[in-house]
């Protein structure tokens, strides 16, 4: 298999790997896709000899982040020996910026916000609400506990529930997003990041090979954090409101997409314009979430095989989105505002297979003079 040969070298040829992965990473080889995605996301170096050491260093760094950032204020027993000023600053009612309690309250707000979204992640599947240790969770009592955990904020759980807490896949998402937000105060956490992380998590875990040191269980969470962080470097501008009108912001991205549509799908474009449908109304989440909410998890993963290979990330996404509109062109032509919005919002339902969407995208690239090298999807 050529793609396996491509990563079994001391130094990986990134251009070759991108070309091979563009047409889809084979599902038949367990653990292959997570390795390929890590390389494409710069989570693994092109120098394969450095992988083991890099994974271990990232693991240790992430463990430090967890210890330092996921904390609760602790009342000191030797308060009598503490300085009076520090005691005042650490009072629960203190709002001093240096106060441990002030930090705790802000962190709790952030924690609760992320928890609320994480519990809604991928509502079309229950995977993220399952216990990490599936073998430990088989009894009716365990299932009842899991349901109670899901329906109750972690901060509001009773002591008995906390003591017997069953950690779920959603808890891993929660932790990673919280640490990311703490380390990136300029971006913080924005709704939708949970869905992006969920695709990475599902891919890495479900295609896991515990015997492989590169994709084994030990490094899963830390590796997810760093690969998610790398992906967000390229997506973050779309989540920043202050950059909305910049070229790299979400409005800039959507403007580029609309300009392509105007050239290659003029009838659909003019219908949308005539009905004064703001392109943001229907395409905002396409760009922010790399279309992962439009398709099933399996379809999203196949689509991301291609999107992650784009050296001009994520310019290719513009063409995919125009291709998506082409599938509903006949439905919206001569339609009114409501017709346009309804069909554009469910455009994915008109796509038979992801391969059909990508082949249409390739046709649009050629029509728009964005040539790729043999990027026809089989």
Predicted regions and their residues:
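Extended, Lys/Glu/Leu-rich amphipathic alpha-helical scaffolds
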Residues: 74-77, 218-281, 313-378
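Active-site-adjacent structural elements in folded domains
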Residues: 129, 156-166, 179-183, 211-214, ...
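Short helix-capping/linker segments at secondary-structure and domain boundaries
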Residues: 42-51, 203-210, 236-239, 294-298, ...
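Solenoid-like repeat scaffolds
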Residues: 25, 308-312
């Amino acid at each position: 298999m050529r793609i396996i040969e491509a990563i079994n070298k001391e130094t990986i040829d990134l251009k070759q790997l991108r070309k091979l992965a563009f047409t889809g990473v084979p599902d038949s080889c367990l653990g292959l896709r997570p390795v390929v995605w890590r390389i494409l996301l710069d989570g693994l170096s092109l120098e394969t000899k450095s992988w083991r050491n890099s994974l271990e260093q990232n693991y240790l760094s992430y463990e430090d982040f967890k210890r330092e950032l996921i904390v609760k204020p602790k009342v000191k027993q030797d308060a009598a020996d503490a300085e009076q000023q520090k005691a005042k600053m650490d009072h629960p009612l203190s709002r001093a910026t240096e106060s441990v309690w002030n930090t705790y309250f802000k962190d709790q707000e952030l924690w609760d916000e992320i928890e609320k979204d994480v519990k809604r992640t991928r509502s079309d599947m229950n995977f993220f609400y399952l216990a990490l240790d599936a073998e430990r969770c088989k009894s009716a009592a365990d299932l009842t506990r899991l349901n109670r955990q899901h329906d109750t904020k972690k901060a509001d759980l009773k002591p008995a529930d906390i003591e017997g807490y069953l950690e779920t896949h959603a808890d891993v998402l929660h932790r990673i997003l919280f640490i990311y937000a703490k380390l990136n105060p300029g971006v913080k956490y924005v709704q939708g990041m949970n869905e992006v992380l969920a695709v990475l998590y599902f891919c890495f875990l479900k295609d896991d090979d515990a015997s492989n040191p590169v994709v084994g269980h030990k490094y899963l969470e830390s590796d997810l954090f760093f690969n998610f962080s790398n992906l967000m470097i390229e997506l973050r501008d779309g989540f920043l409101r202050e950059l909305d009108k910049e070229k790299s912001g979400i409005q800039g991205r959507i403007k580029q997409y609309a300009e392509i549509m105007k050239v290659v799908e003029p009838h659909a474009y003019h219908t949308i314009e005539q009905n004064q449908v703001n392109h943001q109304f229907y395409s905002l989440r396409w760009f922010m979430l790399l279309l992962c909410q439009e398709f099933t998890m399996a379809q999203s993963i196949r689509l991301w095989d291609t999107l992650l290979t784009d050296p001009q990330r994520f310019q290719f996404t513009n063409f995919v989105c125009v291709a998506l509109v082409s599938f509903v062109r006949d439905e919206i032509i001569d339609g009114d505002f409501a017709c346009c919005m309804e069909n554009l919002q469910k455009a994915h339902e008109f796509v038979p297979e992801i391969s059909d969407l990508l082949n249409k995208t390739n046709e649009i690239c050629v029509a728009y003079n964005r040539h790729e090298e043999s990027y026809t999807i089989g």
